[in-house]
């Protein structure tokens, strides 16, 4: 699965930093618009948590980010390193919000929340790519390509196209 890093680097992605390290410092992340990918490079089956580390979405009417283990299993794409594709008008801001959510804090980042029910979520790698194009369009194209290669399945934590 490590050849995925070389493929992504050749496509302009950079970073490849663990969630754990990015939670400590996000200085190296660009403020530019772009797309980002969360990778799990382990070949082993994932261990899912009943209660993940994700925070609750919105302070006024908090929503529980956790779903059943069965739902997580249903969404898992076997033998695939890419587990989430996201978009950002500011990579630093969006990834910051995503990581704060993963630390159990209130955040405005509901997408990709299944990540935080993985026991090894802090070991996952994050990479990103700046783009002059509309990040949402780039994200949609990337998800469409992923689905084409995986029998119609989205990356594990992508709940919409």
Model-identified regions with their sequence ranges:
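GIY-YIG nuclease catalytic motif and its immediate N-terminal context
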Residues: 1-93, 126-143, 159-161
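Alpha-helix boundary/interfacial micro-motifs
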Residues: 50-51, 103-106, 156
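Aromatic- and Lys/Arg-enriched surface recognition patch
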Residues: 97-123
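Basic, gly/Ser/Thr/Pro-rich low-complexity segments located predominantly at protein N termini
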Residues: 65, 91, 107-109, 117, ...
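Generic surface-pattern signal
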Residues: 10-13, 100, 120, 147
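Coupling/hinge elements of helicase-like and P-loop NTPase modules
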Residues: 148-159
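An exposure/low-complexity boundary signal
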Residues: 96-106, 127, 141-148
């Amino acid at each position: 699965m490590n050849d995925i890093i070389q493929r992504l680097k050749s496509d302009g992605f950079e970073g490849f930093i663990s969630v754990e390290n990015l939670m400590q410092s996000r200085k190296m992340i660009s403020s530019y618009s772009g797309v980002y990918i969360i990778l799990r490079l382990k070949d082993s089956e994932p261990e899912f948590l009943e209660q993940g580390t994700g925070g609750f979405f919105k302070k006024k009417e908090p929503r529980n980010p956790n779903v059943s283990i069965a739902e997580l299993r249903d969404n898992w794409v076997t033998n695939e390193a890419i587990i989430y594709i996201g978009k950002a008008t500011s990579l630093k801001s969006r990834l910051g919000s995503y990581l704060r959510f993963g630390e159990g804090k209130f955040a405005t980042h509901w997408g990709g929340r299944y990540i935080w029910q993985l026991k090894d979520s802090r070991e996952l790698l994050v990479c990103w790519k700046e783009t002059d194009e509309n990040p949402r369009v780039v994200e949609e194209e990337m998800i469409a390509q992923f689905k084409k290669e995986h029998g119609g399945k989205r990356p594990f934590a992508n709940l919409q196209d």
